[in-house]
Amino acid sequence: MQRSPLEKASVVSKLFFSWTRPILKKGYRQRLELSDIYHISSSDSADNLSEKLEREWDRELASKKNPKLINALRRCFFWRFMFYGIILYLGEVTKAVQPLLLGRIIASYDPDNKAERSIAIYLGIGLCLLFIVRTLLLHPAIFGLHHIGMQMRIAMFSLIYKKTLKLSSRVLDKISIGQLVSLLSNNLNKFDEGLALAHFVWIAPLQVTLLMGLLWELLQAFTFCGLAFLVVLAFLQAGLGKMMMKYRDQRAGKINERLVITSEIIENIQSVKAYCWEEAMEKIIENLRQTELKLTRKAAYVRYLNSSAFFFSGFFVVFLSVLPYALLKGIILRKIFTTISFCIVLRMAVTRQFPWAVQTWYDSLGAINKIQDFLQKQEYKTLEYNLTTTDVVMENVTAYWEEGFSKLFEKAKENNNNRKISNGDNNLFFSNLLLGAPVLKDISFKIERGQLMAVAGSTGAGKTSLLMMIMGELEPSEGKIKHSGRISFCSQYSWIMPGTIKDNIIFGVSYDEYRYRSVIKACQLEEDISKFAEKDNIVLGEGGITLSGGQRARISLARAVYKDADLYLLDSPFGYLDVLTEKEIFESCVCKLMANKTRILVTSKMEHLKKADKILILHEGSIYFYGTFSELQNQRPDFSSKLMGCDTFDQFTAERRNSIITETLRRFSLEGDTSVSWNETKKPSFKQTGEFGEKRKNSILNSINSKRKFSVAQKTSLQMNGIEETSDEPLERKLSLVPHSEPGEGILPRSNAVNSGPTFLGGRRQSVLNLMTCSSVNQGQSIHRKTATSTRKMSLAPQASLAEIDIYSRRLSQDTGLEISEEINEEDLRDCFFDDVENIPAVTTWNTYLRYITVHKSLMFVLIWCLVVFLAEVAASLVVLCLFPKILFQDKGNSTKSANNSYAVIITSTSSYYIFYIYVGVADTLLALGLFRGLPLVHTLITVSKTLHHKMLQSVLQAPMSTLNTLKTGGILNRFSKDIAVLDDLLPLTIFDFVQLLLIVIGAVVVVSVLQPYIFLATVPVIAAFILLRAYFLHTSQQLKQLESEGRSPIFTHLVTSLKGLWTLRAFGRQPYFETLFHKALNLHTANWFLYLSTLRWFQMRIEMIFVIFFIAVTFISILTTGEGEGRVGIILTLAMNIMGTLQWAVNSSIDVDSLMRSVSRVFKFIDMPTEDGKPNNSFRPSKDSQLSKVMVIENQHVKKDDIWPSGGQMTVKDLTAKYIDGGNAILENISFSISPGQRVGLLGRTGSGKSTLLLAFLRLLNTKGEIQIDGVSWDSITLQQWRKAFGVIPQKVFIFSGTFRKNLDPYGQWSDQEIWKVADEVGLRSVIEQFPGKLDFVLVDGGCVLSHGHKQLMCLARSVLSKAKILLLDEPSAHLDPITYQIIRRTLKQAFADCTVILSEHRIEAMLECQRFLVIEENKVRQYDSIQRMLSEKSLFRQAISPADRLKLLPQRNSSRQKSRSNIAALKEETEEEVQETKI
């Protein structure tokens, strides 16, 4: 970033905004980068502004019972706000005075008034000076008000963020991320955009009073006829506005529905393709789009009428004011033209400025009240700690998470009741919901310094809640907790902040080289780090998107271990690690490196329990056991079934099963679910979409999965998994994740109205608490991952020294926070967020316009029709113009007398002028034909939007995964949210306005030129100057806008990142560090936005200066060249004043159109994506013998269409190579093996070795080479859809879309209810579905949030059974499963898929024992393919992963497992351990 020229600019340079010239020049010549942007002044920095407002807000809180945020804002900004308001008023007053001088000029041409002719030239000079003064007052005032609005937004952004970091977990459970993002993006934009209009709430009434006084002098009481019409029109416009809002509110729900499903499809596009559901998903979205467009059209027609009313009103105002007066008293020309000019100003004040100002105040006060409520929410209270305490003691503690879930279920119940699915047991599902039960009851234990306590228990038992209570996140309602307060924490779902690996581990604690190296070694990160070119200085994106799940988990653990604390809370830190790595880390890090520290480890592994000093087993929130391992064996022989839930499912009664399901539901929000996406959007949030996104959610959040850009969300939006991916630009690089500005308002004066913040979608209530308990990034393979994660060494030499050396004794005076200011610079900050570089030029190309016009054939005809109508209008004007001199000549003899003597009749010459004005007063006379021109245009443009959405949806659904893998989810979602909103809402009316204004200007110029040909000579250079100036400015402004929109992403992304890691942040006390990061992100955005506002003002001022020169030329040409024609001077000057406002407006509209057409460019970019080959790759080449050729083709077609294929499920793989993206490294190389029909094959390999990749390659979801045959049919000889239908799939990330159970199981509607129920019975889903009101018609929302992860897996299983697939692919089906569901899946696999070929990637040894063969993948290749007996007898990876004792049991277990009855599983300890072994391979 560079030093700003503003610092040294002179007063004149500041007044004329000349200091922006260097950046405008640079932007015109080359592409602008972040380094070209100027530093902000200290008065605009987030630190200073937030400190100022926070001080006033604290004062307000301290002094009053009922604090008001507006009082704090008033004390900070009021006087500057009023100063600019007064300047703005003076500028507006000059507009009211101009018509007086115009009247005097016209009067000076009166034949009876020759004495005044000499002063006409001075009056002309006075009129020109008024324009110059207005220009010099208005622009600095508007800029000053925009600047204050920006400062208010920055101060409130910062205040909201600081408050967010202090909120209690209970409050966070009730706030959705969509609400938070909406609070920041939607509400606060109102200050930036609206503050310049706010003063018109008092300026407009004063102006109207002044104008009415001046008009009274001309027309007496008849003045009120025109005013009455304007007031009626203002009320009519308000009514139309209300009707439009009604349609938009109805439409918001439909948009939301469409975006929720679109985001679910985009996030799970792999599953959609695997199930061959593209057509079904397209149909669902197109049906929703149809309903949405009906409402869009209604809203657009109403807005069109509203907009047209303004254009047409001018004529009526003049007509109603002048005509009655003229009929009764007669009128002179001076009065007509003066009245016309006054009415133009009056119309703007009454129908535009005043209503807009009232709306601005209404919106702003609403936003301030929302923020005020938020700032008064309950804060997190830190517990009182005793720093001298060495033990951790808990005495009889009970705690509640506040019941926040009842509303969700009530809503689900209500939604389904509304669908009239009546059913007798509507209440069954909800009746036994124990809302408000304590999450922990009566917990007591004591750990001494240096001890390790293992906490175990089934899902939902309260393990994480226990850690939260120790950290102070969950307040105990009874009992006492004692510890020193110096805590370190490792979350269950690894949280990575944007920054380097080193930053993530040190996390603001002072750096100690020896400690850092020891921790890296103990957490097995050395080898991973050595593979990166930048080593530990590699910059990670949000959520650590470039890392595997195991790497993220180890970095999170390293961060916790690096901090020197008294108590370490480790919440299931080994979840994503293979067994070898886990063993090494547990021994070297937890047992040796941290030997002298107090540790609480949440785990379910038997080996960990054996080594723990104390064991605490929780069951349903209570202590099931507390003591040592030997006591556990003696006192609780059945402990393993409680711990692992190892009873077989069949033993449970229906009631017991119901309670398990209910418990899962009751606690679902605390149970992280790797597939939870967080693109959230508040329901009203999509009134107009723009960036999140949501970002996001990317629901925001982006849920997007709002991947950044939100991302949530988006960027953002989208952008992190939530918001993060929403980047859509370096060309719009980032998320926008949040779509929120009212459509249709001008884009120029506001921050990108179709904003680029995180896009967050989803009408779902996803609380922030849920977000924190979700895994930070999709479990799916990250395509950015370095493919060469060659496996870590199988064994690390034990570090004998680790236990003896205490790395914490080398403490530097104390672990202090780093000095942040030098540490983070803006360039690094931006590097933390992935950008999708879009090659979209800075200015929209003509090719884009051409393609847009030709998308729908009727658009061309409509545009031609508009031109024809316009030519008819101009022709009519010219005809009148030809007749005009004759009429004037005929009446000239009588005109003087009648002017003096007769008052009852309008003077004939005046009449001809007036008639002429009616036909030609081009600024307002599009009356009769305007409607015929505008409505077809708006209607057709919405049809074009419909066509583009349809093409883009098809394109995305049919694009190959290798292309989709290079795009961010949030980026794709932004096209469907933000850009489609632009095409639906903003573009049609902006184009209509532009066409209307352009034609008005052309018409006015033609008329003026015909009346006074000399003026044409002045007009040509002026229009040329406008066009050149626009082209010059557009290059820079669009780039600045793009940089500004990118600058938004880090703000929303940082918010979501902070929320995801809030518990970690608070445990480490890093709030100030993150506030500083947030301020850096804000300052980065401010630098871009301030520069954009300044260059925009430079441009507007230059336009006005060109016009002032034009007006001076017109005035003096007309004064000096016109002889006796007072009417001619009147028309020329009146039209010239009218042209001024209209031409500026037209130029601004053209810039808006260009800006909005960038959305069209992005949509075209997606439409042009390559598609998957739906047809066989190698079609048979015709041979010379055409008959033989036909036979071959027919035979091949028969193979493809044979209903029985595949019949056996035999699979042969030859030389299979797979890549995630074109041109990327091969993840698998030369894989060859074959599987017999009905065989079960287990895939073995370390984390990141390519097991999931192999399953994707089977489905042709990657870039593959080689060949696979199923039952003798090669994948090259049949279509992709046919090939994929041969497989049943249970993916790692389960896909449940928003829709009924029936739709989720059978989206094409191929099966009857009877068949669906039969399959539901087979897989154990019937008891689940029957508990919901409506049963199969119950609508699942938010990714099936009312189902546990296990039930979602059963849904996938049911889909596979229904598809009657012969080959089943399972990718980690037991990950995050409760043991009961896991048993059902095992049982179903044995029964329903007994004759099928099963390929299984799994971490549980127990599941692998049922496989006949194993395929070991290592370093991208097949290392071994053998039976279990062979593998156990040789030195293999499988053998290494199993302890010697277990190995002895495996062979007999293998042989007898099928016959052995499991009804008494817990009887023998050995059998139990073996059955529940959750060790991961």
Swiss-Prot record:
| Entry keywords, A to Z | ATP-binding, Cell membrane, Chloride, Chloride channel, Endoplasmic reticulum, Endosome, Glycoprotein, Ion channel, Ion transport, Isomerase, Isopeptide bond, Lipoprotein, Membrane, Nucleotide-binding, Nucleus, Palmitate, Phosphoprotein, Repeat, Transmembrane, Transmembrane helix, Transport, Ubl conjugation
Q: Where is the lipid attached (S-palmitoyl cysteine)?
A: 523, 1396
* Extracellular-side segments: 99-122, 217-222, 320-339, 880-918, 1012-1013, 1117-1130
Q: Where are the residues linked by the Glycyl lysine isopeptide (Lys-Gly) (interchain with G-Cter in ubiquitin) cross-link?
A: 687
Q: Under which EC number(s) is this enzyme classified?
A: 5.6.1.6
Q: Which GO terms describe its cellular component?
A: apical plasma membrane; chloride channel complex; cytosol; early endosome; early endosome membrane; endoplasmic reticulum membrane; membrane; nucleus
Instruction: Provide ranges: composition bias, Low complexity.
Output: 1453-1464
Residue positions with a glycan: 894, 900
The reaction(s) this protein catalyses: ATP + H2O + closed Cl(-) channel = ADP + phosphate + open Cl(-) channel; chloride(in) = chloride(out); hydrogencarbonate(in) = hydrogencarbonate(out); ATP + H2O = ADP + phosphate + H(+)
List each copy of the ABC transporter domain by range.
423-645, 1211-1444
* Topological region Cytoplasmic: 1-77, 147-195, 244-298, 359-858, 940-990, 1035-1095, 1152-1481
Subcellular localization is given as: Apical cell membrane; Early endosome membrane; Cell membrane; Recycling endosome membrane
Asked if the record carries the keyword Repeat, the reply is: yes
Region Disordered: list its residue ranges.
1452-1481
Post-translational modification as stated in the protein's UniProt record: N-glycosylated. Phosphorylated; cAMP treatment promotes phosphorylation and activates the channel. Dephosphorylation decreases the ATPase activity (in vitro). Phosphorylation at PKA sites activates the channel. Phosphorylation at PKC sites enhances the response to phosphorylation by PKA. Phosphorylated by AMPK; this inhibits channel activity.
Instruction: Give an example GO biological process.
Output: intracellular pH elevation
Region listing for Disordered R region, in residue ranges = 653-831
Cited function? Epithelial ion channel that plays an important role in the regulation of epithelial ion and water transport and fluid homeostasis. Mediates the transport of chloride ions across the cell membrane. Possesses an intrinsic ATPase activity and utilizes ATP to gate its channel; the passive flow of anions through the channel is gated by cycles of ATP binding and hydrolysis by the ATP-binding domains. The ion channel is also permeable to HCO(3)(-); selectivity depends on the extracellular chloride concentration.
Q: Which family does it belong to?
A: Belongs to the ABC transporter superfamily. ABCC family. CFTR transporter (TC 3.A.1.202) subfamily.
What domain notes does the record hold?
A: Binds and hydrolyzes ATP via the two cytoplasmic ABC transporter nucleotide-binding domains. The two ATP-binding domains interact with each other, forming a head-to-tail dimer. Normal ATPase activity requires interaction between the two domains. The first ABC transporter nucleotide-binding domain has no ATPase activity by itself. The PDZ-binding motif mediates interactions with GOPC and with the SLC4A7, NHERF1/EBP50 complex.
Question: Know the name of this protein?
Answer: Cystic fibrosis transmembrane conductance regulator
Organism from which the protein derives: Muntiacus reevesi
Q: Which gene encodes it?
A: CFTR
